[in-house]
Amino acid sequence: MQRQKQNNSALWLVLGGAFVLRMLLATVTKGYPYDMSCFVAWGEKLLADGPAGFYSDGYFADYPPGYLLILGLVALVRRIFAIPYEAKLTYVLLAMVPSLCDCAAAALVWKIGQEKLPGSRLPLLLAAFVAFDPLLLFDSAVWKQIDGAFALPLLLCFYLLEKRRYLPAALLFGAALAIKPQALLFGPVLAVCFLTAIVQEENRFRAFLRCFGGAALALLPPLALGLPFFGAANLLPGLLEKYAGTAASYPYATINGFNWLAALGGNWTPLENPVLLGITWKQLGFFNILLVTLGLVYLAARSVRAGRFSPLLLAAYYGLGIFTLAHCMHERYMVPGVVLTLLAAARWDDIRLFAVGFGMSLTGFINLCTVYSLTGSDDEWLTSATSSSVAILVGLAETVCFVLLLFGVWDIVANGHTLPLPARMAEAAAPPAAPAPQPKWQRKEILALLALTAATAVVSFAYLGSRTAPQNPLDATGTTLTETVTAEGGTAALWVYPGISYGGRLTVADAAGTTLYEKELDYSTCFSWTSVELYDDAGEVFHITVENAQVFELALRSADGALVPVTGGGALFDEQTAVPEAISQLNSMYFDEIYHGRTGYEQLHCLPVYETTHPPLGKDFIMLGIALFGMTAFGWRFAGTLFGVLLVPLAWCFVRRLTRRPWAAAMAGVLLALDFMRFSQSRLATIDIYGTFFILLGAYCMVWYCQRVLAVGVNGAVLPMALGGLAFGLGCAAKWTGIYAGAGLAVLYLGVLYARWRQGQPGFGREFRTAFLGGIAFYVVLPLSIYIASYLPYWWRDPGFGLADWWRCQVSMYNYHSTLEATHPFESRWYTWLLGLRPVWYYRNAYLPAGLKASIAGMAGPVIWLGGLAALLWLLWRQVSGRGSYAGAGVLILYGTQLIPWMLVSRCTFLYHYFPSSMFCLAALALVLATAQDQRRAKRLGAALCAAALVLFVWYYPALSGLPIAAWRADLLNLLPSFGFY
């Protein structure tokens, strides 16, 4: 009885938390605009014109009357309280009923689980998964659709059919039908359930009559609710037109539903188009529907004979079978089938059904995210190479899940064989024990770590950039300066190396004053060599005018490429020995270096800074590199490359502490040393490498802290606590993504405190005080102090710079990021990052001979990103199925808190934003291998992964470094249509 009360309390806590989370998500997201505008407009029209005037001629309203009453109620509340359309409260009101229905579905899963496994914690685990299912969360709270309200009566219908309560089930089916026409997709399952009752019951005549009663009850809700809208005379024609018109309004193979037809390339393809051997998509869809329906009849007949007839199981099979194989499927049509699968998992205590529900929740979540995030963009119809790849890959994954469901259903129906869910999570059953001690560092391991770090440094610093560049500019900022120069030989080209400009101009004129060349100098031209044709004879005099800009150097070249000696020119021609032999990334800025690298120079020279959209710490580090090596390509890239090298031993140490297996740590170090993103991102003078480094350092300190707390208590863990706060502060001061990491650190910080309390050690009150005060000191005060201190270069430039100015900087940063609407040809959404589908094309060398190409791309390292994704999914599955570990949970938390905020970002984003998250992909991969039962096989697999990473790194090195290669070889590197570099 006591356990039952605890389970009930826990259930209410889960449901309450799930509802609150949905309301928060509803508040911070705007919803799918087309559905939102329809729902609001329909409610207002119903309120204004009444039911009889709602379906007026020419007015678009493709929903039946069932849910319109709820929308009318929402409109009434908005009218009473004068709530505008754009108000957050409007979003909350629209999401409230579907969210409550989602929570009711979770409670139903719990109830079914309690009937199957009374007294077990498994029903609570299943209910928690449904309550926080990302597919349902996104559908109800973010998209703000009504599928939760539509699915609930369907779920209750098939639950009652399990109990053989046929007539109430039929009434509930009618309620679902009154809300959405998609209920008709489950009509064959309802019919099978009623017809099998004729076979199962002794009184077959009664069962036969019940079929008619059930049909009448199923039609009652649509008819009763439709009567005020259509009137008695037009009731049946009006309803039939509404249901038939909705079904025929989207004549495409699939309408953003990532299923088998999408995997075949059928998204938004007209139904009459041929797909194979003259067969149209429509014919293929109907054929598949016939197959799925015949399968339903066979499974029903087989299960009746075996005494294992289960409406929930059949409804799950049929709902997902239709979504996977039929035509005209929208992205959200899978929602009822997914929840039915989870109900069936509870009914049959089968982990395979749970796994399918888990897998399809993820594929459906990505499906909805893809459609939602691209709404209103140029890629709204998912026609780009990236979006098409996502649709195909997710469609394949969804199809695989359905095949697994089919095997599971067959095994249960035909053989009565189930694979029970684990009894309970073993670690949760007892207080957490003190972790095993860390293995001692051996000499050979230290030498291996040093050797790997040295090798990484050699590869990273090689071909990084020139250590020579012009340093003395002609500075015409705020004025206009003219220099006269005489060429001592024939000229063919003019090379220009501008500095900082706030909207300036370079003009070259001949002796007669005729303009030969004119170039706008702005933010995009700084510290980058450019070449233009400039043909003239020896002895020609040029008048060169610089207006409101810096120009560090000019150079004249002859037809054979040699430097042309000049007379005069002042500062424009005073460093000819610093002119490079060829223009490339080795001597010029590229991508966002024109913002961050330039700002490092400005900070060093106490100039007004250009880049103010990120905190300054990363640019402070760039400034130090410039101070050491001058304003050269090597100088502005030095600090980032150094941090990229140091990231490798840090990852080694992090994985070693996490897994306690030196071999896994060594594998992680090698994989990161060969990772594409680490290499290219660290050699680019931007700030992401610094944020990533400190995020991983903070994670290392937090794992260290957690282990110390469990071993010796909070009072013995002050050092990692303090160092973790230091790392957190540095990460926030480098980039705001460090704040995302803080959420994960906070969860682990509080979680280990709870775990320590569960250990029941004496003196916990003193430990709690230490944790509380230490948390304030080291994770609030210290990071804030570091963040403020990172603005010291601002104060050096302007001693009057104070806290009010600092605060205005923060407001400006927030406003910039929250209102940014810029687009970029190589932007990508978070769900494409998981597979690295859209690299960022950083640089193309336009000064190469024909037949050669050179590019730099920010790419995903296939081994870490793909292998890590598989490992993360495995850890997540272990966790939600009750078989996880504290280490696995920690990695998932750190990964999730780094990635999830990007799911809510609608601004332009890039693949490199996933770089910090990829550190925990690496940790997940190492953890899965380190905890494998067969360690010999795990080590062999780890070695194979390292070998694969080396081969891939060598193959893709030109695309990561900018090394010129033959054009045919470059074209081979564009492996996917979505790559697009070179």
Residue map of PLM features:
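Aromatic/glycine/proline-enriched transmembrane-helix motif characteristic
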Residues: 202, 242-324, 407-416, 840-894, ...
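Short acidic/glycine- and proline-prone juxtamembrane loop motifs at membrane-interface regions
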Residues: 141-147, 330, 636, 640, ...
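Transmembrane-helix signature of polytopic, membrane-embedded enzymes
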Residues: 81-89, 100, 104, 109-134, ...
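Transmembrane-helix motifs of polytopic, lipid-linked glycan transferases
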Residues: 92-117, 156, 291-301, 638-659, ...
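Aromatic-rich transmembrane-lumenal/periplasmic boundary elements in polytopic membrane proteins
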Residues: 23-63, 69, 219-264, 561-600, ...
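Membrane-interface transmembrane helices that cradle and orient dolichyl/undecaprenyl
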Residues: 114-121, 155-168, 195-202, 349, ...
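Perimembrane helix-loop-helix junctions
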Residues: 186-220, 231-232, 336, 701-712, ...
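Transmembrane helical bundles and short interhelical boundary loops of multi-pass, membrane-embedded
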Residues: 239-255, 298-301, 315, 319, ...
